[in-house]
């Protein structure tokens, strides 16, 4: 196999990985500029690899080892080459081509160490820090593939990520509760007279609902701010924020009085594509050219 064939295989592997495990972000890349799709897929494939470590191990230590491999790889101290790891190979290409900040990628790995343990998310500040270094980081890295790295873009990425990340915490609540993992801030639950055990019981109670409603409300405020900042952003960077259209749809559903946060919701792939297509034609997300 030639090196060119190997790179094509790596790109194809990453595309399939993201399509399988993160269809929303995969679908969003279909509306990005052609030259951005490969680096975007590389970034999202890396995120899939890191965020799925919790699902692939039964004990924290093997998870720590896997995450450390990625940290070493980014630091240039990988145990062996990356030729056998298509995601690492594609990510390194994207880092070199678009000068992606390695520090942000490393912090994303560090934050996902929290996933390996069943310690509760203690405070809203802790949740915001976690989301800022995961969801917000992905928006920031995606913007870099459009040649946009600035304090203004970072500000936009932060609010976009907070809206998306909190929505994802809410969407994952049924699964997390079933394995006794808590990403909803314990401090927030206690402020509303609820507890970790009430969440783990998987039954909607007024105290739990009050805490979750506050969290959804804060996510919607971040989304509102993100859309206001997006309107001022360069046209070429707007398409990478297209996943916000899905976040807006989810937060609207979560805010409804008849929403049960402990009932898993499955969104059809066709519905995801339709939402993204419609949003891509709107003024908010339309790119240049």
List PLM regions with ranges:
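Acidic/His metal-coordination segments adjacent to aromatic residues that form catalytic metal sites
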Residues: 113-126, 201-204
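Catalytic cores of Mg2+-dependent Asp-rich isoprenoid enzymes
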Residues: 1-92, 101-112, 131-140, 152-166, ...
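Alpha-helical transmembrane segments of multipass membrane proteins
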Residues: 141-145
